[in-house]
């Protein structure tokens, strides 16, 4: 868990904002959302494979678009 030391003469709002930013950088909230409900291992693998396919298609479409612009 991120630790924030409140500086001298620092307002609560600024300290809270720094804490939220550090939590966001460490990925705690996304991890909590991911673990909120149990996901079967097969479902987890299926979701990961689908996202990998989606990333690959997105990458290919960007490369094709770049090739088209070159000509």
From Swiss-Prot:
Pfam families: Ribosomal_S21. The keyword Metal-binding does not apply. One of its GO terms (biological process) is translation. The keyword Metal-binding does not apply. Gene3D superfamilies: Ribosomal protein S8. One of its GO terms (molecular function) is structural constituent of ribosome. Keywords: Ribonucleoprotein, Ribosomal protein. GO terms for cellular component: ribonucleoprotein complex; ribosome. Coiled coil: none annotated. Belongs to the bacterial ribosomal protein bS21 family. This is Small ribosomal subunit protein bS21.
């Amino acid at each position: 868990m991120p630790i924030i030391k409140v500086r001298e003469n620092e307002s609560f709002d600024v300290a809270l904002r720094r804490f939220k930013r550090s939590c966001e950088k460490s990925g705690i909230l996304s991890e909590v959302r991911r673990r909120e409900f149990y996901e079967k291992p097969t479902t987890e693998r299926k979701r990961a494979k689908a996202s990998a396919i989606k990333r690959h298609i997105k990458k290919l479409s960007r490369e094709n678009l770049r090739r088209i612009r070159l000509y």
